[in-house]
Design a protein with these regions (language model features):
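Basic nucleic-acid-binding interfaces
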Residues: 1-29, 34-79
Length: 79
């Protein structure tokens, strides 16, 4: 079961996903940056809007889900 998801600033979200094994992939259009996570031979590329001041809890969860993190992995990252 997931802990309560916090709202995060862009730099906090980047630190969180990088600690989970994600890497910077390339610059996207506008304020977006693309990050990649390699799992089981799959490559998941997710755009993150760096122009936002603070990301809402549902947005943070959606980003983590797009990378393929499980509930247990998300709880471990949020410790």
């Amino acid at each position: 079961m997931l802990k309560k998801m916090p709202s995060l600033k862009a730099r906090q979200l980047i630190r969180l996903i990088e600690s989970g094994g994600c890497e910077f992939y390339r610059e996207g259009k506008g304020d977006h940056k693309l990050y990649v996570r390699h799992t089981d031979g799959n490559k998941r590329v997710v755009p993150i809007d760096m122009g936002e001041r603070e990301f809402s809890p549902p947005y943070v969860l959606r980003i983590l889900r797009q990378f393929g993190f499980t509930d247990d992995e998300i709880n471990e990252l949020l410790r």
